[in-house]
Amino acid sequence: MAKVPDLFEDLKNCYSENEEYGSEIDHLSLNQKSFYDASHEPLHEDCMDKLMSLSTSETSKTSKLTFKESVVMVASNGKILKKRRLSLNQFITDDDLEAIANDTEEEIIKPRSVPYNLQSNVKYNYMRIVNHQCILNDALNRSIIRDPSGQYLMAAVLNNLDNAVKFDMGAYTSEEDSQLPVTLRISKTQLFVSAQNEDEPVLLKEMPETPKIIKDETNLLFFWEKHGSMDYFKSVAHPKLFIATKQEKLVHMASGPPSITDFQILEK
């Protein structure tokens, strides 16, 4: 079975030494376009024979071979048509090789399994408090209070709003978000509302101080959205979930009805 790295090593050896093949490849930036036209002398006949011997039937679908050089596409007359630089030292299959030959767009191959947190490393920087000691009322005019254990939040109809939880809303900013991320901290404490999975109660997480930069603790952040007279708090960590209330249920995370995600902010 033909070894793909050996093929490209043979192709590279066919260049004359004065063409500075290696230095051109080494100085490419991964941020630059990955395809470009280049003119070279025709390859020797024996090199073309080796190229023509490669076919998809000779390349394993599951072979875990890695390229440390750029992938090269060569025409029948020996002219280099395309070079592609890989964005990471990734495993290559013949599906990737076929994509290189057929792809008309100029792009860098990205690994299929790169986690989101590796692709987008967002930092949120603290700005200021935008609401002091505000009260959150849901669409049924129930106010947010602490449950009897003090560990969770719940909604209840109150005759005296002094019993409602007062929140300080801290605004953050980042280079990648056009929305306004905020934290909800219980006033005069270091307890921050922390989003959980769908239908799970939100937690009150104690922090030593107001975070100046939030990078990993995105459960503490919510995109504050306003539609008409209603306010919504969408989780940054779980973008499809909102802070919500429901009859006989603790304040939790939900995507919508039957839970209530509409709130009004009452300022003191």
Curated annotation (Swiss-Prot):
The keyword Transmembrane does not apply. One of its GO terms (molecular function) is cytokine activity. The modification N6-acetyllysine is found at K82. PROSITE patterns: INTERLEUKIN_1. CDD domains: beta-trefoil_IL1A (cd23295). Coiled coil: none annotated. Keywords: Acetylation, Cytokine, Cytoplasm, Glycoprotein, Inflammatory response, Mitogen, Nucleus, Phosphoprotein, Pyrogen, Secreted. Its main location: nucleus. Residues 1-112 form a propeptide. Gene3D superfamilies: 2.80.10.50. One of its GO terms (biological process) is fever generation. Pfam families: IL1, IL1_propep. Residues 82-86 are annotated as: Nuclear localization signal (NLS). Glycans are attached at N102, N141. The modification Phosphoserine is found at S87. Cytokine constitutively present intracellularly in nearly all resting non-hematopoietic cells that plays an important role in inflammation and bridges the innate and adaptive immune systems. After binding to its receptor IL1R1 together with its accessory protein IL1RAP, forms the high affinity interleukin-1 receptor complex. Signaling involves the recruitment of adapter molecules such as MYD88, IRAK1 or IRAK4. In turn, mediates the activation of NF-kappa-B and the three MAPK pathways p38, p42/p44 and JNK pathways. The similarity among the IL-1 precursors suggests that the amino ends of these proteins serve some as yet undefined function. Monomer. Interacts with TMED10; the interaction mediates the translocation from the cytoplasm into the ERGIC (endoplasmic reticulum-Golgi intermediate compartment) and thereby secretion. Interacts with IL1R1. Interacts with S100A13; this interaction is the first step in the export of IL1A, followed by direct translocation of this complex across the plasma membrane. Belongs to the IL-1 family. This is Interleukin-1 alpha.
